[in-house]
Amino acid sequence: MTYDINTIYTKYKQLTKKQRQQLLAALQSQGINIVKIEAYEYTDAPGIKHLFFYFAEDSRKAIPYFLLDSEVWEKILQAIYRY
């Protein structure tokens, strides 16, 4: 699946708090133990956007979207696109 991070970032930011909680629950039900998703835009470089993921195994370690396993990233994309 192809993606544009700006589109995914915007779509995620538009989710309500309840939808974000539902998204996490849906991913967890698929065995993806994400406890937090952080949408981040660099203040000193406007337009550069990232999504960081925090997993239950080490909830203090932020993993950028581009370092995720491709299968996990595909499932996350599909889940976000459902909203």
Where are these regions (language model features)?
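Negatively charged, low-complexity tracts enriched in Asp/Glu with abundant Ser/Thr
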Residues: 2-25
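Acidic, low-complexity, intrinsically disordered interaction modules
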Residues: 26-77
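Short acidic DE-rich linear segments
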Residues: 80-83
